[in-house]
């Protein structure tokens, strides 16, 4: 994306980058994250995990840009970021002026603006292309099979959506998180300059560090096969509530059920049935989805 007008503005100066974004600003409120200097730019939990170490509020994009420019003069600045904001609403015209040739036009860009901040190691349930527009970004990636070594935090109470690793990769506590040494041996690190892009495959864990006082990144998320009813993470939450605390023998039975019907470990589990009699075990039609949705809603509404 080195030929983008936005990248040219970012290379010119931080002020030029801010002016470029102001010229596209639709004036709609955006989510602004703010953390005190003591957090060192790392948006995370409080020490006792009773809350988050930053505040989130809605405000004008121009206000965030002005504040970021002012914070450049501070030796110990607070952390400030505008994250995952769709440009279609906030910056109309950005996608047309800065086109991407690889993905369908329906995959719209999102913009991330901030100072020297860190987004804790997490996964996304999408494929991702991230493009550095202004400032440098360091991506540290871990493959999905390192789930067991990354010590994830809670699934439903998170800093920003997906669960995050509790390990601070800048200063890992190996006494508390000893298996992280295995994860670190698999890590891949890429440092992006303005105009560079990185492809992050589905579910690859990534820690993102912004390395300069004024940074802008644009990313594109997409799914190869969109979820037809809910996200897999919601299935996991339901399974935790209904399966995890069963007696061990019963859990093993349900492990076999999932392996057989969901992951099809032994081939097509309903090949012996006529296609029109396979129900939800066959092709997932709109009618089958509606029936499953009704069953789940009825079950979840029970006390």
Specify the residue positions occupied by each region the protein language model found.
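N-terminal accessory scaffold of Fe(II)-dependent oxygenases
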Residues: 1-197, 205-303
């Amino acid at each position: 994306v080195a030929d983008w007008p936005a990248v040219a503005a970012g290379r010119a100066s931080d002020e030029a980058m801010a002016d470029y974004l102001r010229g596209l600003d639709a004036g709609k409120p955006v989510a602004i994250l703010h953390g005190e200097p003591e957090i060192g730019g790392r948006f995370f939990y409080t020490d006792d995990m009773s809350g988050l170490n930053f505040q989130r509020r809605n405000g004008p994009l121009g206000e965030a840009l002005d504040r970021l420019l002012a914070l450049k003069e501070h030796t110990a600045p607070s952390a400030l970021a505008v994250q995952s904001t769709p440009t279609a609403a906030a910056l109309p015209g950005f996608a047309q002026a800065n086109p991407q040739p690889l993905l369908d036009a329906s995959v719209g860009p999102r913009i991330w603006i901030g100072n020297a901040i860190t987004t804790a190691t997490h996964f996304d349930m999408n494929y991702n292309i991230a493009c550095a527009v202004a400032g440098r970004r360091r991506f540290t990636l871990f493959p999905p099979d390192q789930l067991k070594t990354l010590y994830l935090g809670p699934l439903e109470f998170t800093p920003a959506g997906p669960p995050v690793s509790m390990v601070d990769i800048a200063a890992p506590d190996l006494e508390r998180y000893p298996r992280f040494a295995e994860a670190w041996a698999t890590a891949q690190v890429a440092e992006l300059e303005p105009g560079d892009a990185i492809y992050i495959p589905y579910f690859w864990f990534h820690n993102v560090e912004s390395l300069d006082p004024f940074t802008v990144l644009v990313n594109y998320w997409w799914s190869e096969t969109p979820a037809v009813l809910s996200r897999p993470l919601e299935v996991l939450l339901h399974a935790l509530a209904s399966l995890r605390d069963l007696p061990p023998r019963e859990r093993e039975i349900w492990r076999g059920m999932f392996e057989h019907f969901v992951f099809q470990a032994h081939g097509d589990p309903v090949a012996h049935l006529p296609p029109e009699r396979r129900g939800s075990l066959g092709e997932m039609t709109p009618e089958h989805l509606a029936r499953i949705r009704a069953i789940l809603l009825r079950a979840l509404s029970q006390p």
